[in-house]
Amino acid sequence: MDTQKIEAAVKMIIEAVGEDANREGLQETPARVARMYQEIFSGLGQTAEEHLSKSFEIIDDNMVVEKDIFFHTMCEHHFLPFYGRAHIAYIPDGRVAGLSKLARTVEVYSKKPQIQERLNIEVADALMDYLGAKGAFVVIEAEHMCMSMRGVRKPGTATLTTVARGLFETDKDLRDQAYRLMGL
């Protein structure tokens, strides 16, 4: 990540909106923003493979559900935050991930400029590709600051998106069971 370029760009934005970039409260802002971007975009170029490839053998194929995984990310359209909760269900195929690994999977894909629909897809596909799940079902509910702070200005509006892979694609009863276990 080119932090010098980010700092220069932030200074230009400060000046472009009519502020004094040398004012006491703004002098360190370009460097702060560059450090923040390093942190919140730390998922760029990463996948969840390192997290999901460490799994444990299991003899049954009962559904695993982890819900209310809090995340925050940046909308790629306006570079404003959106945040919420991810709910994950999957059917193991002889291997299960450690529970923290599901949260880490959400984190990896949320640490980059993102849209909610793609976040759903990337999490579900990671469970299928790296864990070898028989099925994956991901529900994300989020509030988008680009709707709350600007434009339509409707704070508190939740957007829900879902994606189903494998067994969840064709088995409505399985999806319904996942919804119930997720409390949705």
UniProtKB/Swiss-Prot annotation:
One GO-annotated biological process of the protein = tetrahydrofolate biosynthetic process
Q: What is its EC number?
A: 3.5.4.16
Q: What is this protein called?
A: GTP cyclohydrolase 1
Give GO terms: molecular function aspect only: GTP binding; GTP cyclohydrolase I activity; zinc ion binding
The record lists Zn(2+) as bound by 75, 78, 146
Q: Which UniProt keywords apply?
A: GTP-binding, Hydrolase, Metal-binding, Nucleotide-binding, One-carbon metabolism, Zinc
**Similarity comment: family membership:** Belongs to the GTP cyclohydrolase I family.
Which PANTHER family does the record cross-reference, listed alphabetically?
GTP CYCLOHYDROLASE 1, GTP CYCLOHYDROLASE I
Q: How does it assemble?
A: Toroid-shaped homodecamer, composed of two pentamers of five dimers.
Give the record's pathway: Cofactor biosynthesis; 7,8-dihydroneopterin triphosphate biosynthesis; 7,8-dihydroneopterin triphosphate from GTP: step 1/1
Q: Which Gene3D superfamilies match?
A: 1.10.286.10, 3.30.1130.10
Q: Which domain of life is it from?
A: Bacteria
Please state the span of the N-terminal signal peptide per the UniProt entry. none
**Could you tell me what reaction this enzyme catalyses?**
GTP + H2O = 7,8-dihydroneopterin 3'-triphosphate + formate + H(+)
